[in-house]
UniProtKB/Swiss-Prot annotation:
It comes from Synechococcus sp. (strain RCC307). One of its GO terms (molecular function) is 4-hydroxy-3-methylbut-2-enyl diphosphate reductase activity. This is 4-hydroxy-3-methylbut-2-enyl diphosphate reductase. Its cofactor is [4Fe-4S] cluster. The active site is at E187 (proton donor). [4Fe-4S] cluster binds at C66, C157, C288. HAMAP family: IspH (MF_00191).
Amino acid sequence: MDTRAFKRSLHHSERYNRRGFGRAEEVAGSLEQAYQSELIQSIRENGYELREGRVTIRLAEAFGFCWGVERAVAIAYETRRHYPTERIWITNEIIHNPSVNAHLVEMNVLFIPVEEGVKDFSGVESGDVVILPAFGATVQEMQLLNERGCHIVDTTCPWVSKVWNSVERHKKNSFTSVIHGKVKHEETLATSSFAGTYLVVLDLEEAQLVCDYILGNGNREAFLKRFAGATSPGFDPDRDLSRIGVANQTTMLKSETEDIGRLFERTLLRRYGPTDLNDHFLAFNTICDATQERQDAMFSLVDEPLDLMVVIGGYNSSNTTHLQEIAVSRGIPSVHIDAPERIGPGNAVEHKPLGQDLERLEPFLPEGDLRIGITSGASTPDRVVEGVIDRLLQLAEAGQIAAEIA
């Protein structure tokens, strides 16, 4: 399928919209009430610090809603205003945040049902309005919705679209796209649908396995077994790893994406020599600015003396998980929570350790003075961060009173 030609055709359709409906002022009040926070703004203006009682809160200098997320949510709100009575669907979570998605449900936006990992579009009819989320949608989904006569509202983040352009360029020049991402993540599924031949690698370890194979140090059967489900149909490692272009899921850890790119460049340089390197490797620059800013701010924050790190965001949010990884790598006690309600009752928190299921930690806050670092993923509203801070301060005050009584 010529994905470039399809996109051009779709973008010229009267039933396609990716710029909103000119109703920004109409929805501004609803967005502010639901997602913004005067407390968080005041903390920003106070050097990202709040002191109250025995607690000092230190906010990362970049956190929370990114521009792409703000844009997607605003367009979704505008869509409901523009189509007040029409049936509106969304192909997936608009962003990875439970409170934001709950607000869409309250606005009577329907989510495409998923049965055993497969989306069921059977209920979508001609004339329905369908929102594509910030992560994008696969080209096959877009084609289905277009052929069905739906009104498509595309909130795909422009940074994601930039990655799609990169893998289409790989395809045009007969390069295999090596995508650094999570194979089942919505963004990676969408990106791979625009690629030709592709291979998804999760981390530097998997990238090293691929590079070992390129240099003749691998077993074909073991390779295909390891990457089953992570390649394009008919992928042949003996044929398809001679010309490589690297791309990434925009929310992956910046430093690891860069390491993977350098690893493939060194490997192909070793395999084919400097004269022919450009015929076998394409450089890349698909790291999202917002992801990079939040990770850089997190690295700065964990350089400070902290007693505890609280990372806030959806449990299925890739960029939030990578922020948690940074704290863990520095040995700072840390918790990843998706909502204020995870804190309490009592001196306890329900949180998600890296790579594990939810667990309850009790006691949560230690006695004495505390410096607590806080950050949030790109899909987390300031209002949620405010709720977490309120709970932490209430818990700290209750603990202080209990200690004084004792």
